[in-house]
Design a protein with these regions (language model features):
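N-terminal catalytic cores of NTP/NDP-binding nucleotidyl/phosphoryl-transfer enzymes
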Residues: 2-75, 94-109, 114, 131, ...
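Cys/His-rich short segments
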Residues: 115-168, 172
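Helix-rich, typically C-terminal accessory recognition domains appended to large enzymatic cores
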Residues: 120, 343-381, 391-499, 612
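Beta-strand segments within the central parallel beta-sheet cores of soluble alpha/beta enzyme folds
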Residues: 287-290, 474-476, 579
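Intrinsic disorder at enzyme termini
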Residues: 473-554
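Phosphate-backbone binding interfaces of nucleic-acid-interacting proteins
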Residues: 535-655
Length: 655
């Protein structure tokens, strides 16, 4: 019987590139919680996905020479591939470019505007593009973004703003009456003291300085800013409708039981998000947990250095479950954790190869050696058995208690305490000594049965954290993994079962020097590729010949517009010139251009081009020219007409 629903989410990953191991940690942590809850009897719905709008993506797409949609399609697929590689058992992978999400975001924005929570104004301050955050001068830290430490730039634009102060006291009251809402407690104190109690400013919720976003449908020069786009995925992904027609799934699952996010975005999820929900008259999530960061031990990860750690690289070296074990077990509850090649090798060798792998291998090998692989409980119990059984059957309660507070690392420690107790039991009972005395055959059989049963229970408890390893252990012992309830009683392993004849080595020991050498070679190769790509990129960039500066008043004197070439013919007695009739609004201008080596007259007809309209007329090769077509020229002298990205009408002014 189900213990009830459990709806949990991760923050959706920003689709600006391949996620490194620090980004991947959150997905693995969330997966371990989702798997634990499912196994513990809850009806779990686990949602993750990708955040796919914003200026940063627009810029990266332009840099890559693709459309923003093409860019995020590729980036989202790569993120999903990594999540799948790591065994992430999500129920929904949402993308914020999905039509259903975009439609609901527009509805939500309109509803909040209609009820007076959103109004139009203008923004004048500093902006951090990577964080997509606005800041006042007083909020900057040493003149830089207080969140990421990067450079900021001035920003001034028309925008819509959400009146945060309207709901601030209500949120303060909710936090005070629901101490579990923000966890760990240190994150709660930070939000209260640094943001809520000093007072909230209005929040910018639209942008006009870039186009890659969800349009505000009643004012389409604006796009919805990240907060109302990305955060609302938690409700749009399960069928929320702003007009009151939400799905049965939404009614069943909302409010979320857990938002699992990085500590760097705790403010957005514990202040902005609950206030949006209050404005929509929807219940607040039961808990927001801000996990710490996973940092690289030998310094900050940098793509330019070629030393970024990616999950698939680590999997190639260590295997999926070894990477899962490390990121889950080595992360403290509140403080940042560290990952390095040396630490990975150390943990694999000591915990996985020795404590766990060697235990399973020894137990199976002894069963094969002494009893032909048959494991039977002969009832020859001794006092030492009771302590083993107490540790084994008591482990689930300890693990469950740790998981109540999402102390995953501590839960795994409890499970490995079980395995360590099994290893101690081998030392205490000395099966190799018992095997020398035929009179003690029943005692030997009982010892091996107790070990096998203990390992099965341990593997069953380990399943949420290392699912592949747990299944391998069960298969080698010729049994199935247990429910958590079955892990609290001893003796479930069917007496007389036969284990595998050739046990598989779960984790092979690694040589740290060899691993470091291979990793260094990998990073060098990656760095070389990055440098080569940068050189190719630089080859596409020309040094601009600088001319004297002009004033804005000088610039205003020039008039540029879109023109459509309706007729074109070569200029007689010239090998370089073409004479074009260019429609600009209701007027047709004759323009002579030196582009005959690059375009035929036939190719020119029908093109939309950029025109300097008010250039003083002059004669070229005896033919009157009343303007100038704008072209770009590369280092080899190749010309290309400058054309509008979208189909614009002839006469549209260029501003």
């Amino acid at each position: 019987m189900s213990k009830g629903k459990f709806y949990m989410t991760t923050a959706i990953a920003y689709a600006s590139g391949k996620p490194h191991i620090g980004n991947t940690y959150e997905a693995v942590l969330a997966d371990s919680i989702a798997r634990f809850k499912r196994k513990d009897g809850y009806d779990v719905f686990f949602q993750t996905g990708t955040d796919e709008h914003g200026q940063k993506i627009e810029l990266k797409a332009a840099e890559a020479g693709v459309t923003p949609q093409e860019y995020v399609d590729k980036a989202s697929a790569e993120i999903k591939r990594i999540w799948d590689l790591m065994g992430t058992s999500y129920d929904k992978f949402i993308r914020t470019t999905e039509p259903d999400h975009e439609k609901q975001v527009q509805k939500i924005f309109k509803r909040l505007y209609d009820q007076g929570d959103i109004s139009k104004g203008s923004y004048d301050g500093m902006y951090c593009t990577p964080c997509e955050s606005f800041w006042t001068q007083s909020q900057l830290k040493d003149g830089k973004c207080p969140d990421c430490g990067r450079e900021v730039k001035p920003a001034k634009e028309e925008a819509y703003f959400f009146r945060m102060s309207k709901y601030a006291q209500r949120l303060i009251d909710h936090i005070n009456s629901h101490p579990e809402f923000i966890q760990p407690v240190s994150r709660k104190n930070e939000m209260m003291n640094n943001f809520l109690l000093p007072g909230l400013q209005d929040l910018c919720v639209s942008r006009t300085s870039f186009k890659w976003g969800i349009p505000v449908d009643f004012d389409e020069k604006h796009v919805v800013y990240v907060w109302l786009d990305a955060l609302t995925n938690y409700i749009t992904g399960i069928g929320y409708d702003a007009e009151g027609n939400s799905s049965e799934q939404y009614k069943k699952l909302w409010p979320a039981d857990l938002h699992l996010i990085g500590k760097d975005i705790i403010r957005f999820h514990t202040i902005y998000w609950p206030i949006f929900l209050m404005a929509l008259n929807e219940p607040l999530p039961k808990q927001v947990f801000g996990h710490p960061w996973l940092l690289q031990g030998d310094g900050k990860m940098s793509k330019s250095k070629g030393n970024v750690l990616y999950a698939d690289d680590l999997v190639d070296f260590f295997g999926v479950d070894a990477v899962r074990y490390f990121v889950l077990h080595e992360m403290p509850f509140e403080n940042d954790g560290v990952i390095s090649w040396e630490l990975m090798v150390e943990r694999l060798n000591s915990d996985l190869a020795n404590t766990l792998g060697n235990l399973v291998n020894r137990t199976i090998s002894m069963s094969n050696k002494y009893f032909g692989g048959v494991v039977a409980d002969k009832g020859a119990a001794e006092a030492v058995d009771e302590d083993l059984k107490a540790v084994v059957t008591g482990t689930y309660d300890k693990v469950a208690a740790k998981m109540e507070g999402w102390r995953v690392a501590d839960a795994i420690t409890d499970i490995f305490t079980l395995f360590k107790r099994c290893n101690k039991y081998i030392d205490e009972t000395e099966p190799w000594v018992l095997a020398k005395d035929p009179a003690k055959a029943d005692r030997l059989a009982t010892v091996l049965y107790n070990l096998t049963e203990s390992i099965v229970i341990g593997a069953s408890l380990l399943e949420p954290y290392m699912p592949g390893t747990a299944e391998k252990i069960a298969a080698q012992l010729n049994t199935s993994l247990r429910s958590f309830e079955e892990c609290t009683t001893f003796g479930g392993y069917i007496s007389g079962s036969k284990v595998t004849e050739k046990p598989e080595i779960l984790f092979a020991r690694l040589d740290v020097k060899e691993v470091l050498e291979k990793a260094a070679a990998m990073f060098e190769a990656r760095k070389a590729l990055a440098e080569e790509a940068e050189e190719e990129k630089e080859e596409d960039v020309m040094e601009l010949t600088k001319k004297p500066e002009i004033t804005f008043e000088d610039f205003e004197k020039m008039q540029f517009a879109v023109g459509e070439i309706i007729k074109c013919e070569p200029v007689p007695k010239s090998k370089k010139l073409l004479c074009s009739q260019v429609k600009i609004g209701k007027e047709v201008k004759q323009i002579v251009s030196g582009i005959r080596a690059h375009y035929t007259a036939e190719e020119m007809v029908g093109k939309k081009v950029m025109v300097l309209v008010n250039l003083k007329p002059a004669k070229l090769a005896g033919v009157l020219s009343e303007g100038m077509l704008l072209c770009a020229e590369d280092a080899e002298g190749n010309l290309a007409l400058v054309t509008p990205e979208k189909n614009m009408p002839a006469g549209a002014e260029i501003c």
